[in-house]
A protein has these predicted regions:
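Conserved C-terminal structural/oligomerization subdomain of aldehyde/semialdehyde dehydrogenase
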Residues: 127, 322-454
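ALDH superfamily catalytic-core signature
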Residues: 4-8, 136-155, 169, 173-180, ...
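General beta-strand structural signal in soluble alpha/beta enzymes
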Residues: 107, 157, 190-192, 213-216, ...
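N-terminal Rossmann-like NAD(P)+-binding subdomain of aldehyde/semialdehyde dehydrogenases
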Residues: 1-120, 147
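Flexible, glycine/charged-enriched surface loops at secondary-structure junctions
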Residues: 27-34, 181-188, 263-270, 297-305, ...
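Solvent-exposed alpha-helices and their adjacent loops that cap or buttress functional pockets
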Residues: 111-112, 120-126, 149, 180-184, ...
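Conserved small-residue-rich beta-alpha loop and adjacent elements
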Residues: 93, 97-177, 181, 230-234
Length: 454
């Protein structure tokens, strides 16, 4: 029997989403929390089953890469897909953390009374149906389903095909555990078709989704931003900068640079461009770049001043850096590559940040209060840090729990996309018969009588 065309397949999955989303929006906090804890217990109980499914995914990835790439690349691809018991424990812990977070739905964010007696309040409500397209591991799958459930949204999830069996094994247990705790059937939808067209049809589904979140590389984000027919929550390729001021604690700043770049080089909030005040460059840069090159195998691309300084290191046996191209200053690398530039002062650093595209995360390493305050005031980013690793631009670092990525948008969500960012606000107004004036002149005896009522 021939397969259903991809468009019909996606349309069929989305058909009942709006109805189920209305049910999810009305669930009480205790029911959702109980379900999330049951889901955590089920993942822990299904550990062997999940790892067995993952082993099949790993074998499939290994076979697909055998004839196409070098052994090193094949090993890297296999390592990326393989899950361990530690990953299962992390999934379980994340589910329990989400269960323990306050329920944002129904929270009153503000309330006031008008002179005419109107009692006005703003209340948080779910967004509705949220699509998530991920190129990342099953940890992102679970975060997406858990956060959408907790915030009263229905999640339509399309994961990376290389984890297809792993996703199915995890999702089956989660679904059964959730339904046993009173969650409606169809509380989330998993798109299982591996074709890219399935993701494209989801992006183009228009009014079937209220928002969409891409989790992956620059190519995915660009495709979603260009073709989506609904609001998109994601970072728009914004860069992460770190400026080292001339007044700084050098060991502290060096540790921040290393952590920001190598703790997770592929993350959106990993360091892309390092700006160093030139007076301390000779003292600050050589030890840091030496570690990045030799210890962490980071490719360093430097401005002319930086390459001239570090060129002396190459003569003494160290791996050297390469000259930076113009495009490097505008690139979100999401990998083991770092651009380094020596600047004259804070003015030049700020001008560089403004002149090279959107900024997602910005850090200043300084002991000078005035410099710190100016930097935080003038840099336009989702987060601006003082003497803190850029990797801490995340929901858990802020005490907000897990997140479904970072957003660089100026509208709705800017920064980590956590529970609160998966809701919107509506106005709830109580009154006692207040009318908009002037009220229409009565045209009949009945109208006149109604207006005279106390």
């Amino acid at each position: 029997m021939p397969e259903i065309p991809v468009k019909l397949y996606v349309d069929h999955l989305l058909k009942e989403c709006r109805h189920v989303a209305r049910q999810l929006a009305l669930l009480s906090g205790p029911i959702k929390d109980d379900a999330l804890r049951a889901m955590a217990d089920r993942v822990a109980a299904d550990e062997e089953l999940i790892l067995a499914a993952n082993s099949k995914d790993v074998d499939a990835v290994g076979k697909s890469y055998e004839k196409e790439v070098t052994k090193d690349r094949m090993k890297a691809a296999v390592a990326r897909v393989r899950m361990t018991p530690d990953h299962i424990k992390e999934i379980v812990e994340r589910l329990r953390v989400v269960a323990d977070l306050p329920d944002p739905v129904g929270a009153v964010t503000s309330r006031w009374e008008r002179p005419n007696g109107l009692q006005v309040s703003r209340v948080r409500v779910p967004i509705g149906v949220i699509g998530v397209i991920s190129e990342m591991s099953p940890l992102v799958t679970v975060d997406s389903l858990a956060l959408c459930l907790k915030s009263g949204n229905l999640c339509v999830f399309r994961g990376a095909p290389e984890w297809s069996l792993t996703h199915k094994a995890i999702e089956k247990g989660l679904h059964e555990a959730a339904e046993q705790r009173g969650i409606p059937a169809g509380a989330w939808v998993l798109i299982e078709r591996p074709e890219k067209e399935a993701a494209i049809e989801l992006i183009r589904s228009g009014k079937s989704l209220d928002a969409i979140i891409p989790r992956g590389g620059t190519g995915l984000r660009k495709a979603v931003l260009e073709h989506a027919k609904m609001p998109v929550l994601c970072d728009d390729g914004g860069l992460t900068y770190l400026y080292v001021d001339e007044d700084t604690d050098i060991p502290l700043a060096q540790n921040i640079v290393i952590n920001s770049k190598v703790q997770s080089a592929g993350a959106a909030n990993a360091l892309d461009t390092l700006l160093v005040q030139q007076f301390i460059g000779r003292q600050f840069l050589p030890p840091v770049i030496n570690r990045l090159l030799d210890e962490f195998k980071v490719e360093v691309r430097g401005c002319p001043k930086t390459t001239a300084l570090i060129g002396q290191m190459a003569m003494s046996g160290h791996t050297s850096i390469i000259p930076a191209m113009d495009a490097d200053w505008c690139t979100q690398f999401q990998g083991p590559v770092l651009a380094v530039k020596m600047v004259e002062n804070l003015d030049e650093a700020l001008a560089h940040i403004v002149g090279h595209g959107p900024c997602l995360t910005a850090v200043i390493a300084t002991t000078r209060y005035e410099s710190a305050m100016r930097f935080t005031r003038e840099v336009d980013a989702s987060a601006v840090f003082v003497n803190v690793s850029s990797r801490l631009n995340a929901g858990d670092s802020y005490g907000m729990g897990a997140d479904i990525g970072l957003s660089g948008s100026r509208l709705h969500a800017k920064g980590p996309i956590c529970l609160e960012q998966l809701t919107c606000e509506k106005y709830v107004v109580f009154g006692s018969g207040q009318l908009k004036v002037p009220h229409p002149v009565p045209e009949s005896y009945f109208d006149a009588i109604m207006l005279k009522r106390p």
